[in-house]
Protein backbone atom coordinates (compact mmCIF):
# COMPACT_ATOMS: atom_id res chain seq x y z
CA UNK A 1 0.00 0.00 0.00
CA UNK A 2 1.23 3.48 -0.83
CA UNK A 3 0.00 7.01 -1.53
CA UNK A 4 -0.26 7.71 -5.23
CA UNK A 5 1.63 10.77 -6.49
CA UNK A 6 0.72 10.57 -10.18
CA UNK A 7 -2.47 11.72 -11.91
CA UNK A 8 -2.39 9.22 -14.77
CA UNK A 9 -1.81 5.49 -15.11
CA UNK A 10 0.42 3.92 -17.73
CA UNK A 11 -2.78 3.01 -19.59
CA UNK A 12 -3.92 6.66 -19.67
CA UNK A 13 -6.62 6.59 -16.98
CA UNK A 14 -6.89 9.85 -15.04
CA UNK A 15 -6.64 9.50 -11.26
CA UNK A 16 -6.63 11.79 -8.28
CA UNK A 17 -3.28 12.39 -6.60
CA UNK A 18 -3.15 11.50 -2.93
CA UNK A 19 -5.30 8.36 -3.09
CA UNK A 20 -4.11 5.15 -1.50
CA UNK A 21 -3.08 2.41 -3.90
CA UNK A 22 -2.85 -1.36 -3.37
CA UNK A 23 -2.01 -4.27 -5.66
CA UNK A 24 -4.67 -6.98 -5.65
CA UNK A 25 -5.33 -9.80 -8.10
CA UNK A 26 -3.06 -8.45 -10.82
CA UNK A 27 -4.28 -4.85 -10.85
CA UNK A 28 -4.02 -1.67 -8.81
CA UNK A 29 -6.92 -0.41 -6.72
CA UNK A 30 -7.39 3.16 -5.44
CA UNK A 31 -9.30 4.97 -2.68
CA UNK A 32 -9.07 8.33 -0.86
CA UNK A 33 -9.68 6.58 2.46
CA UNK A 34 -9.00 3.05 3.71
CA UNK A 35 -9.25 1.18 6.98
CA UNK A 36 -6.30 -0.84 8.25
CA UNK A 37 -5.23 -2.79 11.31
CA UNK A 38 -1.55 -2.82 12.21
CA UNK A 39 -0.24 -6.26 13.17
CA UNK A 40 3.51 -5.52 13.21
CA UNK A 41 5.52 -2.31 12.88
CA UNK A 42 9.23 -2.73 12.14
CA UNK A 43 12.04 -0.30 11.31
CA UNK A 44 14.67 -0.52 8.59
CA UNK A 45 17.13 1.78 6.84
CA UNK A 46 17.45 2.06 3.07
CA UNK A 47 19.39 3.91 0.39
CA UNK A 48 17.77 4.33 -3.02
CA UNK A 49 19.30 5.29 -6.37
CA UNK A 50 16.71 7.65 -7.88
CA UNK A 51 18.47 7.80 -11.26
CA UNK A 52 18.64 4.03 -11.65
CA UNK A 53 15.29 3.49 -9.93
CA UNK A 54 16.56 0.72 -7.67
CA UNK A 55 17.73 0.22 -4.08
CA UNK A 56 21.42 0.45 -3.26
CA UNK A 57 21.23 -0.78 0.31
CA UNK A 58 18.75 -2.23 2.80
CA UNK A 59 19.23 -3.02 6.48
CA UNK A 60 17.73 -5.70 8.66
CA UNK A 61 14.32 -5.00 10.17
CA UNK A 62 13.93 -4.57 13.92
CA UNK A 63 11.03 -3.75 16.22
CA UNK A 64 12.83 -0.72 17.69
CA UNK A 65 15.46 1.77 16.54
CA UNK A 66 17.94 0.65 19.19
CA UNK A 67 21.20 -1.09 18.39
CA UNK A 68 22.98 -2.00 15.17
CA UNK A 69 21.15 -2.35 11.85
CA UNK A 70 23.42 -4.58 9.75
CA UNK A 71 22.98 -3.86 6.05
CA UNK A 72 23.60 -5.35 2.62
CA UNK A 73 26.77 -3.28 2.10
CA UNK A 74 28.47 -4.78 5.13
CA UNK A 75 27.89 -1.75 7.33
CA UNK A 76 25.38 -0.27 9.75
CA UNK A 77 22.19 1.60 8.78
CA UNK A 78 23.29 1.90 5.12
CA UNK A 79 25.77 4.62 6.11
CA UNK A 80 23.42 6.84 8.13
CA UNK A 81 25.55 8.73 10.64
CA UNK A 82 24.59 9.70 14.17
CA UNK A 83 24.56 13.44 14.90
CA UNK A 84 27.95 13.38 16.65
CA UNK A 85 29.60 11.72 13.64
CA UNK A 86 27.92 14.01 11.12
CA UNK A 87 28.93 17.16 13.03
CA UNK A 88 32.62 16.33 12.53
CA UNK A 89 32.37 16.23 8.71
CA UNK A 90 32.36 18.98 6.10
CA UNK A 91 29.23 19.50 3.99
CA UNK A 92 30.89 18.04 0.89
CA UNK A 93 32.21 14.92 2.62
CA UNK A 94 30.88 11.88 0.68
CA UNK A 95 30.00 10.13 3.93
CA UNK A 96 27.76 13.02 4.95
CA UNK A 97 26.19 13.24 1.49
CA UNK A 98 25.37 9.53 1.62
CA UNK A 99 24.10 9.78 5.19
CA UNK A 100 21.59 12.48 4.25
CA UNK A 101 20.22 10.29 1.45
CA UNK A 102 19.57 7.31 3.73
CA UNK A 103 15.94 6.90 4.79
CA UNK A 104 14.46 5.37 7.93
CA UNK A 105 11.40 3.30 7.08
CA UNK A 106 8.50 2.21 9.23
CA UNK A 107 7.31 -1.05 7.71
CA UNK A 108 3.67 -1.71 8.51
CA UNK A 109 2.36 -5.27 8.26
CA UNK A 110 -1.39 -5.57 8.57
CA UNK A 111 -4.74 -5.88 6.83
CA UNK A 112 -6.78 -3.42 4.78
CA UNK A 113 -10.53 -3.14 4.34
CA UNK A 114 -12.71 -0.73 2.42
CA UNK A 115 -14.30 0.13 -0.89
CA UNK A 116 -11.73 0.82 -3.60
CA UNK A 117 -11.83 1.32 -7.35
CA UNK A 118 -9.95 0.06 -10.35
CA UNK A 119 -8.43 2.67 -12.66
CA UNK A 120 -11.52 2.47 -14.91
CA UNK A 121 -13.84 3.18 -11.97
CA UNK A 122 -15.01 -0.38 -11.23
CA UNK A 123 -15.70 -0.70 -7.50
CA UNK A 124 -14.10 -3.47 -5.45
CA UNK A 125 -14.81 -4.28 -1.80
CA UNK A 126 -11.80 -5.48 0.19
CA UNK A 127 -11.98 -7.20 3.56
CA UNK A 128 -8.83 -7.86 5.57
CA UNK A 129 -6.46 -7.86 2.60
CA UNK A 130 -2.90 -8.54 3.84
CA UNK A 131 -0.66 -5.55 3.15
CA UNK A 132 2.90 -4.35 3.65
CA UNK A 133 3.42 -0.59 3.55
CA UNK A 134 6.50 1.61 3.96
CA UNK A 135 6.13 4.98 5.70
CA UNK A 136 9.17 7.23 5.32
CA UNK A 137 10.10 10.85 4.64
CA UNK A 138 6.98 13.00 5.18
CA UNK A 139 4.92 9.93 6.01
CA UNK A 140 7.16 8.80 8.84
CA UNK A 141 6.20 11.11 11.70
CA UNK A 142 2.39 11.02 11.26
CA UNK A 143 2.38 7.22 11.56
CA UNK A 144 5.05 7.14 14.26
CA UNK A 145 3.21 9.67 16.43
CA UNK A 146 -0.10 7.89 15.95
CA UNK A 147 1.27 4.48 16.92
CA UNK A 148 3.08 5.99 19.90
CA UNK A 149 -0.20 7.52 21.04
CA UNK A 150 -1.91 4.13 20.92
CA UNK A 151 0.94 2.53 22.85
CA UNK A 152 0.91 5.28 25.48
CA UNK A 153 -2.77 4.54 26.10
CA UNK A 154 -2.04 0.82 26.42
CA UNK A 155 -4.07 -0.06 23.35
CA UNK A 156 -3.73 -3.56 21.89
CA UNK A 157 -2.69 -2.21 18.51
CA UNK A 158 -3.60 -5.19 16.24
CA UNK A 159 -7.20 -4.90 17.46
CA UNK A 160 -7.49 -1.18 16.62
CA UNK A 161 -9.09 -0.16 13.33
CA UNK A 162 -7.19 2.77 11.85
CA UNK A 163 -8.94 5.13 9.45
CA UNK A 164 -6.42 6.42 6.92
CA UNK A 165 -6.94 9.53 4.84
CA UNK A 166 -4.35 11.85 3.28
CA UNK A 167 -3.65 15.55 3.55
CA UNK A 168 -2.06 17.82 0.95
CA UNK A 169 1.16 19.52 2.03
CA UNK A 170 3.62 21.86 0.37
CA UNK A 171 7.31 22.58 0.85
CA UNK A 172 8.61 25.32 -1.42
CA UNK A 173 7.35 24.50 -4.90
CA UNK A 174 6.85 20.81 -4.12
CA UNK A 175 3.36 19.51 -3.32
CA UNK A 176 2.95 16.12 -1.67
CA UNK A 177 0.51 14.11 0.43
CA UNK A 178 0.93 12.79 3.97
CA UNK A 179 -1.03 10.08 5.77
CA UNK A 180 -3.66 11.14 8.30
CA UNK A 181 -4.43 8.24 10.65
CA UNK A 182 -7.28 8.38 13.15
CA UNK A 183 -8.43 5.80 15.64
CA UNK A 184 -11.55 3.79 14.89
CA UNK A 185 -13.25 1.09 16.87
CA UNK A 186 -11.35 -1.70 18.64
CA UNK A 187 -12.13 -5.38 18.20
CA UNK A 188 -12.67 -7.48 21.30
CA UNK A 189 -10.23 -10.16 20.14
CA UNK A 190 -8.09 -11.36 17.24
CA UNK A 191 -9.39 -14.08 14.97
CA UNK A 192 -7.53 -17.30 14.24
CA UNK A 193 -6.89 -15.93 10.75
CA UNK A 194 -5.32 -12.82 12.28
CA UNK A 195 -2.98 -14.93 14.42
CA UNK A 196 -1.94 -17.06 11.44
CA UNK A 197 -1.22 -13.92 9.42
CA UNK A 198 0.85 -12.42 12.23
CA UNK A 199 3.01 -15.55 12.27
CA UNK A 200 3.37 -15.33 8.49
CA UNK A 201 4.46 -11.70 8.74
CA UNK A 202 7.04 -12.63 11.38
CA UNK A 203 8.36 -15.35 9.07
CA UNK A 204 8.56 -12.78 6.26
CA UNK A 205 10.64 -10.44 8.42
CA UNK A 206 12.90 -13.29 9.53
CA UNK A 207 13.46 -14.39 5.92
CA UNK A 208 14.25 -10.83 4.87
CA UNK A 209 16.75 -10.47 7.69
CA UNK A 210 18.44 -13.75 6.78
CA UNK A 211 18.86 -12.50 3.21
CA UNK A 212 20.30 -9.17 4.40
CA UNK A 213 22.73 -10.91 6.75
CA UNK A 214 23.91 -13.25 3.99
CA UNK A 215 24.81 -10.25 1.83
CA UNK A 216 26.27 -8.42 4.84
CA UNK A 217 28.57 -11.34 5.65
CA UNK A 218 29.55 -11.85 2.01
CA UNK A 219 30.77 -8.25 1.86
CA UNK A 220 32.71 -8.66 5.09
CA UNK A 221 34.32 -11.87 3.87
CA UNK A 222 35.31 -10.10 0.65
CA UNK A 223 36.86 -7.24 2.61
CA UNK A 224 38.83 -9.64 4.78
CA UNK A 225 40.08 -11.47 1.71
CA UNK A 226 41.26 -8.20 0.16
CA UNK A 227 43.05 -7.25 3.38
CA UNK A 228 44.70 -10.68 3.59
CA UNK A 229 45.86 -10.32 0.00
CA UNK A 230 47.39 -6.91 0.72
CA UNK A 231 49.15 -8.25 3.82
CA UNK A 232 50.49 -11.19 1.86
CA UNK A 233 51.91 -8.86 -0.79
CA UNK A 234 53.52 -6.71 1.91
CA UNK A 235 55.07 -9.81 3.47
CA UNK A 236 56.41 -11.06 0.14
CA UNK A 237 57.92 -7.64 -0.56
CA UNK A 238 59.60 -7.59 2.85
CA UNK A 239 61.43 -10.91 2.38
CA UNK A 240 62.55 -10.42 -1.22
For the regions a protein language model found, what residue spans apply to each?
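Detector for Asparagine
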Residues: 26, 58, 70, 105, ...
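Glycine- and charge-rich intrinsically disordered segments
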Residues: 1-15, 192-240
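Detector for methionine-enriched segments
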Residues: 1, 44, 116, 141-143, ...
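OB-fold ssDNA-binding interfaces and closely related basic DNA-contact patches used
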Residues: 4-124, 171-172, 176, 186-188, ...
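Weak global preference for isoleucine
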Residues: 3, 36-40, 56, 108, ...
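Extended serine/threonine-enriched, polar tracts that run as long, contiguous segments within proteins
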Residues: 103-187
